[in-house]
Every structure is written in C-alpha cells, then in structure tokens.
C-alpha cells in the first residue's frame, strides 16, 4: 500500500520547520504524526500554512489534474517525477511572478527570459534560483568565502540523496555529493561520507540498513528512496543545476544534458 502523500510531504518539511525556517510553530504535531504514521485535519492545516511549499503543490496539482496531497504531487515537488514536465512554463512564470513572497517581479521576469521560459516547479530549483537571483546577483564576481557560504546554504536547503554506509542510534553515515562552487558554477562535488540525523521511530527508518539511499534535508534523513526516486532526484537536480548556472552566467549558457 502506497504511503500517504501527506506523510511524505511532512517528512521532507519537518526539519526546516523544526529550525524555524518554514511553516507555523507546529513541529510537535508534525513529529507526532510521523511517529504514529497517521494523518488528520490538523496536520493537513499545518502543512497548508507553509508559505512556499504548499503553493507549489497547488500549482503542480492544478496543472496535472491531481489532488494536492496525491502522493505523486509532493513527490514531484521534493524529489521530481514526470508531473514536473507537465506544468506549462507560462503557469510557473505566472505563479512565480504573483504568488511567491519575497520575489522581485522584475528579477523573476528577467530570469524566465534568460531561461527561455523553461523551469521546473521543483524544490531544488526554487532553492538554487532564489540564491542565484536574490542572494548572489553578482554571480561570477562573488568572493571565495561568499561562494563557500552560498554553496553550503544551497546544499543544506535542497533535497540531496546519500547511500547509507553506517547506522547508529540517531545518526547515519551516508555517502553524498554536496554542492560546491566550481569555476563560477554550482556543481556536485566528489563523493564524501557525512553524518546526518534520522528518527528511528519514523517508518521506514526502524529497518534502515547499509546500501539504502535516503533523501536528506538540512542534514536530516527524511525518507528511504526507491531506485526510481533516487534516479529522478539525481536527474532533476542536474536539470536544476544547469538552469541555475545559466542564471549565474547571465543566461548565456544552455542547461547541461
């Protein structure tokens, strides 16, 4: 039986909410629901109050004829799947221009023009493009220290993936490729082993083992991914990086295949 899309979404929204970055002050409600593997109207209401994530789910659902918490919708936003390819660029542009708080409409328009109107409503693209168009407008002229800080922020805030190499009580050792600045571009660095937190009380981490691939958000393992999901996350991350590097270069570079 497929997991609830509500719980899948909550797993990936949990850590930034705990850190106070996103959503209402309802982390214990989210945590309790994840531990018990149950959903209710209170959890749904809490997730609807995430000012960035929930409008993205609405956009994907509206564009593809799905319900907002159909499993495939939050999966598309956090991990990536074929639904992203069905969201018209014009819809995403209108959404970014009018609905995303904190975005300069002029910069949004310039960004979409430089990308020929092609951009996925994917969490990692949102994260990377936010820094590319607002935090780091100087692009290649950034100092080395600024580049390091931006790369670290992007790496923490995106959804990354890692292969489990060791399992502790509340920490996993994972083999991961972090984000770095390389030759003025954001890129995946060579693999390294890192420690991340996880909650063994949340399914499926009670049985996590070496060789599993997990999704990671703010140094916290969110879920164990299927082979299809890990391939999709790698695929859409590569697309996101290609597009964002065009923004950093002033729209002069084509996305990498």
Language model features: what each stretch is:
Residues 1-148:
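N-terminal intrinsically disordered, low-complexity, charge/repeat-rich segments that act as generic
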């Amino acid at each position: 039986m497929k997991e609830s899309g509500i719980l899948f979404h909550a797993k990936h929204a949990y850590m930034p909410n705990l850190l106070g970055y996103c959503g209402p002050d309802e982390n214990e409600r989210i945590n309790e629901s994840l531990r018990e593997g149950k959903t209710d109207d209170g959890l749904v209401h809490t997730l609807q109050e995430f000012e960035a994530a929930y409008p993205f789910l609405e956009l994907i659902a509206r564009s593809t004829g799905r319900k907002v918490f159909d499993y495939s919708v939050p999966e598309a936003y956090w991990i990536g799947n074929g639904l992203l390819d069905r969201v018209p660029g014009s819809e995403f542009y209108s959404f970014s221009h009018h609905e995303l708080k904190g975005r300069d409409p002029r910069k949004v328009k310039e960004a979409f023009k430089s990308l020929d109107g092609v951009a996925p409503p994917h969490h990692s693209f949102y994260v990377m493009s936010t820094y590319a168009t607002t935090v780091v407008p100087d692009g290649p002229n950034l100092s080395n220290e600024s580049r390091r800080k931006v790369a670290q922020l992007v790496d923490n805030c995106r959804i990354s993936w890692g292969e489990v190499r060791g399992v502790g009580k509340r920490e996993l050792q994972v083999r991961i490729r972090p984000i770095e600045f390389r030759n003025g571009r954001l890129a995946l660095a060579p693999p390294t082993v890192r420690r991340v937190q996880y909650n063994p009380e949340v399914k499926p981490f009670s049985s996590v083992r070496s060789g599993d691939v997990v999704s990671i958000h703010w140094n916290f393992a969110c879920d164990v991914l299927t082979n299809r999901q890990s391939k999709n996350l790698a695929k859409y991350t590569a697309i996101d990086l290609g597009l964002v590097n065009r923004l950093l270069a002033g729209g002069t570079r084509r996305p990498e295949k």
